UniProtKB/Swiss-Prot annotation:
<feature type="transmembrane region" description="Helical">
    <location>
        <begin position="153"/>
        <end position="173"/>
    </location>
</feature>
<keyword id="KW-0472">Membrane</keyword>
<dbReference type="Pfam" id="PF04279">
    <property type="entry name" value="IspA"/>
</dbReference>
<keyword id="KW-1003">Cell membrane</keyword>
<feature type="transmembrane region" description="Helical">
    <location>
        <begin position="93"/>
        <end position="113"/>
    </location>
</feature>
<protein>
    <recommendedName>
        <fullName>Inner membrane-spanning protein YciB</fullName>
    </recommendedName>
</protein>
<feature type="transmembrane region" description="Helical">
    <location>
        <begin position="56"/>
        <end position="76"/>
    </location>
</feature>
<keyword id="KW-0812">Transmembrane</keyword>
<feature type="transmembrane region" description="Helical">
    <location>
        <begin position="32"/>
        <end position="52"/>
    </location>
</feature>
<keyword id="KW-1133">Transmembrane helix</keyword>
<feature type="transmembrane region" description="Helical">
    <location>
        <begin position="7"/>
        <end position="27"/>
    </location>
</feature>
<keyword id="KW-0997">Cell inner membrane</keyword>
<comment type="function">
    <text>Plays a role in cell envelope biogenesis, maintenance of cell envelope integrity and membrane homeostasis.</text>
</comment>
<dbReference type="InterPro" id="IPR006008">
    <property type="entry name" value="YciB"/>
</dbReference>
<feature type="transmembrane region" description="Helical">
    <location>
        <begin position="126"/>
        <end position="146"/>
    </location>
</feature>
<comment type="similarity">
    <text>Belongs to the YciB family.</text>
</comment>
<dbReference type="GO" id="GO:0005886">
    <property type="term" value="C:plasma membrane"/>
</dbReference>
Length: 200
C-alpha cells in the first residue's frame, strides 16, 4: 500500500504532542497521572498517523510499545523508576540495532530515512554510525539526568530538551548528506560496485 507523506506540522504534532501532554499533566497533577495520559496520547498519535498516512513509522511503533510496557509497570507497581528508565531502553535499543547492523554491513538508518535521501553506501555507513553514537549518548544523558535531578527537571528535559537536541544533531549531519548525495543513476552504479548496505 502506498504511503501518504504527512504535512510537516502533522508529523511534529504526533511526535511532540504526547510529550506536551506528559509535561502539563505532570505539572498539574503528578508523574503517575502524566504517565497514564502519556500512554493514551501515544496510542492516539499512532492511530492518527495511520489514519492520515496509512502507515506507522517503525521508530514510533517501537517507542509506543516500550512506553506502554514501562508505563504499565510504573502504574501497577507505583514506581516512577520504570517510566524514567524507559528513554534509556529506547535509545539503547536504537543504538544497538544501528551499531549491530553495521557489523553485518547493513545500514538500518536508510530504512528510517526511506525516500528522503539518496546516499552512497559509504555515506549511509557513516550516517548510521553517527546516529548510533547519538542514541548511545542520549541513553547515557537520560540516566545521568533522572538519577541526579528532580522529577520535574527530568520531565522538562524529556518534553522540551530531547527534540531540540535531536534537531540540532540532525541539522549537523547535512554537510555529510550533501557530500555523499548522489542522483539515482549514479547511486545504482555505486551500489553495484560497493554493495547496497541498506539492503544487505
Amino acid at each position: 500500500m502506498d504511503k501518504t507523506q504527512p504535512h510537516p506540522l502533522f508529523k511534529l504534532a504526533t511526535e511532540l504532542g504526547p510529550l506536551i501532554v506528559f509535561f502539563f499533566v505532570n505539572a498539574k497533577f503528578n508523574l503517575f497521572a502524566a504517565t497514564g495520559a502519556f500512554m493514551v496520547a501515544i496510542i492516539a498519535a499512532l492511530i492518527a498517523s495511520y489514519v492520515v498516512t496509512r502507515h506507522i513509522p517503525l521508530m514510533a511503533l517501537v517507542t509506543a510499545v516500550v512506553v506502554i510496557v514501562f508505563g504499565t509497570l510504573t502504574l501497577v507497581l507505583h514506581d516512577e523508576t520504570f517510566i524514567k528508565v524507559k528513554p534509556t531502553i529506547i535509545y539503547g535499543l536504537f543504538a544497538a540495532v544501528l551499531g549491530g547492523g553495521l557489523v553485518f554491513n547493513r545500514s538500518f538508518i536508510a530504512i528510517m530515512f526511506d525516500q528522503m535521501f539518496n546516499l552512497t553506501p559509504a555515506g549511509w555507513r557513516i550516517l548510521t554510525f553517527r546516529w548510533a553514537l547519538f542514541f548511545a549518548g542520549m541513553a547515557v544523558l537520560n540516566e545521568i539526568i533522572w538519577r541526579t535531578q528532580s522529577t520535574d527537571f527530568w520531565v522538562g528535559f524529556k518534553a522540551f530538551g530531547v527534540l531540540p537536541l535531536t534537531m540540532i544533531f540532525a541539522i549537523a549531519q547535512m554537510p555529510l548528506i550533501k557530500r555523499y548525495h548522489q542522483d539515482p543513476a549514479s547511486l545504482e552504479a555505486s551500489d553495484a560496485a560497493e554493495g547496497d548496505v541498506s539492503k544487505g
